[in-house]
Amino acid sequence: MSDIADKVKKIVVEHLGVDESKVTPDASFIDDLGADSLDTVELVMAFEEAFSVEIPEDAAEKIATVKDAIDYIEKQKAA
Amino acid sequence: MFSLSGKTALVTGASGGIGAAIARQLHAQGATVVLSGTREAALQELADSLGERAHIAVANLSDPAEADGLVAKAEAVAGAPLDILVNNAGLTRDTLAIRMKDSDWSQVMTVDLESPFRLARAALKGMLRRRAGRIISIASVVGTTGNAGQANYAAAKAGIVGMSKSLAQEAGPRGVTVNVVAPGFIETPMTDVLPETVREKLIGSIPLGRMGNTGDVASAVVYLASDEAAWVTGTTLHVNGGMAMV
């Protein structure tokens, strides 16, 4: 697992208070991890801070799963 | 009832009459208070008179950066996360609209509407995470009734109400409440200088037959800040002696 994936996982566990084993790549923040809309905004803000990236509103809306978040941040970091 | 023991509160505009009364009452209920304003000497004097659990954080809220940084500054001097934010600071630039300068409008908007938003935004981040918090903003009866000569002030105060209702909906799921206190005519040095006939006419329009005092406003803030008000959010508590029943 990449450093980014590792860090994303850690942030999700910390913010949503879920068990690490549940944070699989395909896990949906809302459907599988019990997040509400405020949680997802807080997660996006936590990602922005942790990775020093800016995630605009339209991109944030498309981040539904753990993998979505990892992919988006990896793409930003590679650019 | 209404104990605020163990809570930390930031009061902006604490060197003014209403702000100081709010700070005193929050402190009397057991809260640690951070007094903010532009006049350091006045803030320090108030802090000294309160004794323990009183800190100061000087900030000029017409400067966006200072407004953005005030919550962090307050938490640093208090050494604790913020439980209660009281947006009380405000200024007026009264004049009839046809004579109102752009700067009269923008100064009032910046200090009376934009800075409360900046403070609330900063405070909410921590409050949402901690799943607790109180945001109370001081508006005015004129935000509801309007007032000749105060198009800027009335617009800003009405804006506070709309903003607070929106924030209340956003923060509700986390147990954070956002409310407004809207005072009517309050005895201050400004109203002391009114001619007696004007005063009498003013009081005649108030069913409870007197001007309000700063303590009347502070008591409403204490209530909304308390655990007892846990199921009250997005509301405006009018403290005006019945002058406007809205």
From Swiss-Prot, chain A:
Gene Ontology BP term (one): lipid A biosynthetic process
Sites bearing O-(pantetheine 4'-phosphoryl)serine, chain numbering: S37
GO cellular component, one term: membrane
MF (Gene Ontology): acyl binding; acyl carrier activity
Subcellular location: Cytoplasm
Span of domain Carrier: 2-77
Cited PROSITE patterns: CARRIER, PHOSPHOPANTETHEINE
Reported modifications of this chain: 4'-phosphopantetheine is transferred from CoA to a specific serine of apo-ACP by AcpS. This modification is essential for activity because fatty acids are bound in thioester linkage to the sulfhydryl of the prosthetic group.
Metabolic or biological pathway, per its Swiss-Prot or TrEMBL entry: Lipid metabolism; fatty acid biosynthesis
Keywords (A to Z) from UniProt: Cytoplasm, Fatty acid biosynthesis, Fatty acid metabolism, Lipid biosynthesis, Lipid metabolism, Phosphopantetheine, Phosphoprotein
Predominant localisation class: cytoplasm
TM spans (from-to): none
Purpose: Carrier of the growing fatty acid chain in fatty acid biosynthesis.
PANTHER family cross-referenced by the UniProt entry: ACYL CARRIER PROTEIN (PTHR20863), CARRIER DOMAIN-CONTAINING PROTEIN (PTHR20863:SF76)
HAMAP family the record matches: Acyl_carrier (MF_01217)
Name listed for the protein in its UniProt record: Acyl carrier protein
Species per Swiss-Prot/TrEMBL record: Gluconobacter oxydans (strain 621H) (Gluconobacter suboxydans)
